[in-house]
Amino acid sequence: MDQWLETKQLPVHFVSAAGVVYQDGKVLLIRSERRGWEFPGGIVEQGEALLDGLRSEIFEESGIAAEPEAVAGIYQNLARKKGFGPLEGMTLPTTVNLVFRCRYVSGKEVVSEEFLEVGWFTPDEAMRIIRYPYMKKAFEDAHRYSGKPHFVTFRKADRDIAFISDCMI
């Protein structure tokens, strides 16, 4: 249980934040070459406040300023996976991702260097075009948010995904 005390190696997890941003009934999505359509977000930098990291990721990836309104879900990926791009050759730690429902504040869509497209879609369109299983599940949970966030545990390596548990907290 406290194995890290014996080995003197502190546990390491990535903490990330993502935002399902709504404006006039539409949802903001970005498209990457690797995962297709998804909502903006990313790893929170060490020493950075979670909500500041969320706002920053949304703006950097889309040009849109957004304000978080509620935590829609907490998603824990138990898989340690191989890095890609600049992280190739590394084994990445497990990830805990907080997904927020957000409202549009200002800005115009801008495609960043990391992504191919940015756009606004109806929720039905978003459900059709989001292909990445974890993103699809998180979007579905955020869109159907009823005041209680989902807590989902899964194991994802490459394209395979196994959902282990899903409960409302």
List each model region and its residues.
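Short connector loops at helix/strand junctions that flank enzyme active sites
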Residues: F14, Y22, R34, A66, ...
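Conserved Nudix-box catalytic region and its N-terminal flanking loop in Nudix hydrolases
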Residues: Q23-E60
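Active-site-adjacent beta-strand/loop module that shapes the phosphate/pyrophosphate-binding cleft
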Residues: A79-K108
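Short, well-ordered beta-strand micro-motif
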Residues: V21, V99-R103, W120-T122
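Nudix hydrolase/Nudix homology domain
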Residues: W37, E113-I169
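Acidic, metal-coordinating catalytic segment for phosphate/diphosphate chemistry
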Residues: M1-A18, D24, M90
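A short coil-to-beta-strand element that immediately follows conserved catalytic motifs
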Residues: A65-I74
